Regions:
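NAD(P)+-binding Rossmann beta1-loop-alpha1 motif at the extreme N-terminus of oxidoreductases
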Residues: 1-52, 56, 125
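Rossmann-like NAD(P)(H) cofactor-binding subdomain of soluble oxidoreductases
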Residues: 17, 42, 54-59, 63-130
Length: 131
């Protein structure tokens, strides 16, 4: 059962996912990571914990969303390898980043999925493609 979800990157897609996840009946705890301290506005949302760096709480998540820019992946991947649970599913929302690049960046230690969606996810009307 999914209880904890981590989202790395706090941009528009992350905001959409948070808003939609909080509308479901499931009681998810969401760990949100972003280096920009201005994104701490999410801390006022129930069940959302904001951190400026990836930490040990990543290992408690069953699903990890990568909602970052592709050029940041090489830095983030090191923290995922260090703190992530190898049983977690890592779902990449990074535009233009092939699945084999993600697998290699994570040392092929995680179950990885590439997902393409759009901003309509905030309304529950997005078309999403999963690889």
């Amino acid at each position: 059962m999914i209880e904890n979800i981590s989202i790395i990157g706090a941009g528009n897609l992350a905001k959409c996912f948070i808003n939609r996840l909080l509308t479901y009946k499931g009681k998810y705890k969401i760990f949100l990571y972003d280096i920009d301290k201005r994104q701490d506005k999410y801390t006022s949302i129930k069940n959302v914990k904001f951190y400026r760096s990836i930490n040990q709480y990543l290992s408690e998540s069953q699903i990890v969303f990568l909602a970052i820019k592709p050029h940041d992946f090489k830095y983030v991947s090191k923290d995922i390898i260090e703190y992530g649970d190898k049983k977690s599913i890592v779902i990449s929302l990074m535009a233009g980043t092939k699945l084999n690049v993600i697998d290699q960046g994570l040392n092929k230690d995680f179950c990885t999925v590439r997902m393409m969606t759009n901003i309509n996810a905030q309304f529950g009307n997005a078309q999403s493609f999963i690889y």
